[in-house]
Amino acid sequence: MNPLPDAFRNTALAHRALHDDLRPENSLAAAEAALAAGYGMEVDLQPSSDGVAMVFHDATLARMTGRDGRVRDFTAVELSQIQLGESEAGIPTLSDLLSLVAGRVPLLLELKDQRGGQGGSDGVLEAGTLKALEGYDGPVALMSFNPAMVEVLAEMGSAWPLGLTTCDFR
């Protein structure tokens, strides 16, 4: 098991980056604001139809974009052109975020459950996430509510710390 980097213990994390009415959640503008404030970030990942890890919370586009459809039904290029809220920014890829952050603050990446009910995993989001992280030099940890996704990450040989997110645990 890979230990959690010390940076996670010493840095506050902005949930979905530092967002507000002008900077949509999980956007590069929200990430820039978190960086400027000295915060690390927790962001959410969904897969595109071509297997790219996209920085987006919901499985569907409606709440954040006003568009119909599931994130996983669009390519990364198509998603990058879909406007987030009232901003002019499109949905960023994980690679976009990593380029912006460049190892300066810790990133906690939540891989969103793709099957519902924490069922199995097809491995698409896990593979896209690990591909984006290849060669990245900065503090990162990966987590999911779906234990199967955490298991797939481990089986794929993730060099990053892995965690299981939970709630109402008794």
PLM regions: where:
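Phosphate-group recognition and catalysis centered on beta-loop-alpha active-site segments
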Residues: 1-170
